[in-house]
A protein has these predicted regions:
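Well-ordered alpha-helical scaffold segments within catalytic/enzyme domains
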Residues: 1, 31-45, 96-114, 158-173
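Acidic/His metal-coordination segments adjacent to aromatic residues that form catalytic metal sites
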Residues: 13-18, 74-87, 140-148, 216
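Long, well-ordered core segments of solenoidal/helical folds
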Residues: 1-13, 46-73, 119-137, 181-198
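Aromatic- and histidine-enriched alpha-helix N-cap/loop-to-helix transition segments
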Residues: 23-34, 88-103, 151-162, 181, ...
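A glycine-biased, small/acidic residue-tolerant capping/turn segment at secondary-structure junctions
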Residues: 196-212
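Conserved small/polar residues in nucleotide/adenosyl-binding loops
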Residues: 218-226
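A beta-strand-loop signature enriched in Asp, Gly, Thr, and Trp
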Residues: 122-182
Length: 226
């Protein structure tokens, strides 16, 4: 309620004063909007959805590449390029967003005028992301430069696998097109689960693509640290 009553107007440029008090990095779209959406559903008060929607769309305007149907991690990466000359789109960062969209759509009232925006965004992103799956069924740290990041990355792959199955189960994705992709991703993830329940090939904590040169073992909630 304090945030809603005292909205911030700082620039979302990453190094601008006060930018971190707003959702200036794509991970934040999982951290904050999902909570507002859930509170809005529990209380039934429109103000939580109104604030969430306004702030989300400001971040969307700042970080979403319409041409690529993917989010930059933050404004620092908009003009950066990978070794192959492609834009820098972080796998896990985009996973945070697709995961967030499932919660927002699930909790937002069916009649809310912006709900169609989130459904459309979800479909756009999953359509693009599905084309970036590798032959094994994984996604990589950098979505557009798998040559520089040849090892699979399972925190991004986990987010995308969840998002695919959620979209299928809720009728937002066509089974004929997306079910084979989702099953392939699930089987890929299952293949790197160790006997002790830990999963391999998780990128370390960070804010951008990093190489997974060894089989890093994390518990399933390691991604909570971003």
């Amino acid at each position: 309620d304090t945030l809603i009553a005292n909205p911030r107007h700082n620039s979302l440029s990453y190094y601008a004063d006060g930018s971190h008090s707003r959702w200036c990095w794509c991970d934040a779209l999982f951290m904050a909007p999902t909570s507002f959406a859930r509170i809005g559903k529990i209380t039934g008060e429109p103000k939580y959805f109104e604030f969430m929607d306004k702030e989300f769309q400001i971040t969307y305007d700042s970080l979403y590449s319409v041409a690529d149907s993917l989010f930059f991690r933050d404004t620092r990466y908009i003009n950066m390029r990978e070794q192959n000359g492609k834009k820098v789109f972080w796998g896990r960062g985009n996973g945070w967003v697709t995961g967030a969209l499932t919660f927002i759509i699930d909790n937002m009232p069916a009649q809310h005028p912006s709900r169609v925006f989130y459904i459309s965004l979800f479909r756009q992103m999953l359509k693009k992301i599905s084309t970036l799956q590798d032959k094994q069924g994984f996604w990589h740290s950098s979505l557009l430069d798998t040559a520089s990041y040849p090892m699979p990355e399972t925190s991004a792959s986990g987010f995308f696998t969840y998002s695919l199955f959620w979209g299928l189960n809720h009728g937002y994705l066509e089974k004929e097109e997306y079910l084979p992709i989702a099953k392939k991703a699930w089987n890929a993830l299952a293949s790197v689960v160790h006997e002790d329940g830990k999963i391999g090939y998780v990128q370390p904590i960070g804010a951008d693509p990093k190489k997974v040169d060894i089989c890093l073992l994390y518990t399933s909630d390691a991604a909570d640290d971003s």
